[in-house]
Amino acid sequence: MDKSGIDSLDHVTSDAVELANRSDNSSDSSLFKTQCIPYSPKGEKRNPIRKFVRTPESVHASDSSSDSSFEPIPLTIKAIFERFKNRKKRYKKKKKRRYQPTGRPRGRPEGRRNPIYSLIDKKKQFRSRGSGFPFLESENEKNAPWRKILTFEQAVARGFFNYIEKLKYEHHLKESLKQMNVGEDLENEDFDSRRYKFLDDDGSISPIEESTAEDEDATHLEDNECDIKLAGDSFIVSSEFPVRLSVYLEEEDITEEAALSKKRATKAKNTGQRGLKM
């Protein structure tokens, strides 16, 4: 708001105060005289648009006054957009960056790898089918399908791991036999035969020691050259069936024969009916 507007407001307020004082002094003499309400500039709501709008009175006052060097800029759409852009630029400057720039270049450096040669290498790797198998050449199959190659490779890997397992087992067995002072047996026997042989096959299998009485009986038997012993027939099961079981078996045979005869009769009836229909 310019200086002329402020002077006019001060003049209006001073006039209102003088009228109020006069009305207070003359209220005792005249009761019918009306009083003037003082003007209160604070109570009114100021319109913000009036700051930028220039009235003809204010223009005349600004021309007449020598102190009023500042003139308000009219509100336009262009000014609003420029103000918004300036605010946006200030906000960007104040905004902190999450990652501080290091100054290093991004991406793959140029001249390190030729994309044409990389594509050629990829095609060669895709077309190459690994090492060839000699038994396929006998079958006149130079380029085997991918499924066959996969099965052959799996079989080779399986055989390799089985052989490693066998060597590991042989190594552990040799160490255990050396600790038991039985290392001489490995020179005379094959490993595959020793693999399925127990270490205590030569000795007694049962840990219970036999009594001396049984040894004496064995010596007497050797002298007499008779190793046959008589035993009771209590453990022998008789092969004769009881009476009840035989009856049940006969009844089952009869029922099976009756069922077979019924089936034959029904089949004969069905065939006769079909012949009549035809």
Curated annotation (Swiss-Prot):
UniProt keywords, alphabetically: DNA-binding, Nucleus, Phosphoprotein, Transcription, Transcription regulation
InterPro entries registered for this protein in UniProt: TAF1D
Entry's transmembrane regions: none
One Pfam family named in its UniProt record: TAF1D
Residues found modified as Phosphoserine: 23, 138, 234
GO biological process terms, semicolon-separated: regulation of DNA-templated transcription
Domain of life: Eukaryota
Ranges where the record places region Disordered: 20-71, 88-116
GO molecular-function terms, A-Z: DNA binding; identical protein binding
Basic residues bias (residue ranges): 88-99
Compositional bias annotation for Polar residues: 22-33
Assembly behavior: Component of the transcription factor SL1/TIF-IB complex, composed of TBP and at least TAF1A, TAF1B, TAF1C and TAF1D. Interacts with UBTF.
Protein name from the UniProt record: TATA box-binding protein-associated factor RNA polymerase I subunit D
Organism: Homo sapiens
Gene: TAF1D
